[in-house]
Design a protein with these regions (language model features):
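Transmembrane alpha-helices and adjacent helix-loop boundaries
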Residues: 1-220
Length: 220
């Protein structure tokens, strides 16, 4: 017999795990996109050293496991005198990881804008800033929005990795509950359902945002 009711007393811990998972996901996405924007600009820069450095960063991060990157930040940095809490180390590692993927997504968006479109904007008397905002930025965001939405969901699922360093997100909470109740099936089934609700909820939210911002605006 399954005993899901026995997990009710841990609802507070589960809620805290959900909140930390969401917090890590949102802050990581913001920081990662900021890093990614800088790297994407470097990748498309006419200055070769910048392009080389940016490419090395992207290739190094995208071709090594997130868990290894996390361990370098949490266990490696203390050896040079930099000691971080589990949550801070998780945020830094996830942001660095997201930065590499975000850079490639943003670069693809910028490169999807043809030079003729920019030239047309300038010929209409738009300033460089207005051209970037109206001719480059909005179409680029529209082109990469689905990829960014999917990347957010992937980052949210990837937060489960940070339980390996003791960050008390959702998966770590599940391990704690399992160790107290020995109800492994019930615990991980509940956590699986929690992740499913979160991911489907955010996918629906992103789809609604896309419709209101891009589809509805164009129809007007």
């Amino acid at each position: 017999n399954f005993r899901f009711g026995a997990l009710w007393r841990f609802r507070g811990q589960i809620l805290e795990g959900v909140l930390l998972t969401l917090q890590l996901s949102v802050v990581t996405m913001i920081c990662g996109l900021a890093i990614g924007l800088v790297v994407a600009m470097a990748r498309t820069s006419p200055i070769q050293p910048l392009r080389v450095i940016a490419r090395i960063y992207v290739e190094a991060i995208r071709n090594t496991p997130l868990l290894v990157q996390l361990f370098i930040v949490f266990f490696g940095l203390p050896s040079i005198g930099i000691k971080l809490s589990a949550n801070t180390a998780a945020l830094i590692a996830l942001s660095i990881n997201m930065g590499a993927y975000g850079a490639e997504i943003l670069r693809a968006g910028f490169e999807s804008i043809r030079t003729s479109q920019v030239e047309a904007g300038r010929s209409l008397g738009l300033t460089a800033g207005q051209t970037f905002r109206h001719v480059v930025l909005f179409p680029a965001i529209k082109a990469i929005y689905p990829a960014l939405a999917s990347q957010f969901v992937l980052i949210m699922l990837a937060t489960s990795v940070v339980s390996s360093i003791g960050a008390t997100e959702l998966f770590n909470t599940a391990a704690f509950i399992d160790s107290r109740t020995y109800l492994s099936f019930e615990t991980y089934a509940l956590i699986t359902a929690s992740y499913l609700v979160l991911t489907l909820g955010f996918r629906a939210l992103f789809a609604a945002i896309y419709w209101f911002v891009f589809v509805r605006r164009v129809r007007r």
